[in-house]
């Protein structure tokens, strides 16, 4: 079966979210023949069966959905205005905007959240390039810690950030800035600054970037009341609380760490 769903198709930049088809103009400009592209289906649909040589038995494939969209579904963000944010290497915030597309005036992305019964539910999305990757940098490059799990103990040992801040633009900045030329800045350093202060600045920077994303959403007329979070970074209790404080929003942390797999299972189970 040569097929995909609308959420994955929308990631190719070849998909027209208005017509729910491959964009003819883009394909023509890039000289891509439409017949080589997969059929676009609902997120819950018949995608064929697995081959016995791989899975032992032939099992039906009834759910296909993009990574971040699957996490949104797994977090049960089915209502308009519901938000999930995944904090892994990067961070990805997705807000369900319902059956109507909202085109951001504040540099957020409009995408497909999921598609069922030939009807799309849309979302606004913002991407943070460096979240947990900042902790990896501190561990692997700067040798400030040995394990990522040490960060919670480190930040809790400090009464404040001592005026030390990090702009983690190691690979540019994502939404809402979209500046590929931006580079990282560590400011407020004094002779008293040590590894602990830098670690705290790294952890705090993800919350501050999240604040910028949520402010963009508010300017687009959407004010979330809660945020559902998952990913490796939110295992840090201090970060989860700091995130809530910075955003001034209640943060709900999923007990299920595999929300992406759960969302895909939800889609499969609808068939």
Where are these regions (language model features)?
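Short acidic capping loops at alpha-helix termini that bridge into adjacent secondary structure
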Residues: 34-36, 225-226
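Gly/charged, well-structured mid-domain segments that form the phosphate/adenylate-handling core
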Residues: 39-46
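Active-site core segments that coordinate phosphate-bearing ligands/cofactors
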Residues: 1-4, 8, 13-24, 28-29, ...
């Amino acid at each position: 079966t040569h097929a995909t769903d609308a959420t994955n198709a929308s990631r190719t930049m070849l998909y027209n979210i208005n017509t729910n088809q491959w964009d003819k103009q883009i394909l023509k400009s890039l000289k891509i023949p439409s017949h080589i592209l997969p059929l676009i289906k609902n997120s819950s649909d018949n995608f064929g069966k697995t081959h016995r040589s791989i899975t032992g038995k032939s099992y039906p494939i009834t759910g296909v959905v993009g990574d971040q969209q699957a996490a949104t579904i797994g977090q049960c963000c089915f209502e308009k205005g519901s938000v999930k944010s995944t904090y892994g290497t990067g961070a990805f915030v997705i807000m369900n905007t319902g059956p109507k597309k909202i085109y951001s005036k504040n540099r957020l992305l409009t995408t497909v959240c999921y598609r069922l019964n030939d009807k799309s539910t849309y979302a606004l999305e913002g991407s943070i390039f460096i979240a947990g990757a900042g902790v990896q940098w501190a561990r692997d490059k700067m040798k400030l810690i040995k394990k990522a799990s040490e960060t919670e103990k480190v930040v809790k040992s400090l009464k404040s950030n001592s005026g030390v801040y990090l702009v983690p633009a190691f690979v540019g900045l994502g939404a809402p800035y979209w500046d590929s030329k931006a580079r990282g800045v560590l400011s407020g350093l004094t002779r008293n600054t040590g590894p602990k202060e830098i670690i705290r600045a790294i952890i705090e920077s993800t919350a501050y970037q999240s604040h910028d994303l949520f402010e963009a959403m508010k300017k687009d007329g959407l004010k979330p009341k809660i945020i559902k979070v998952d990913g490796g970074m939110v295992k840090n209790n201090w970060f989860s609380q700091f995130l809530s404080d910075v955003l001034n929003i209640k943060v709900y942390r999923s007990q299920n760490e595999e929300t992406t797999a759960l969302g895909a299972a939800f889609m499969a189970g609808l068939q």
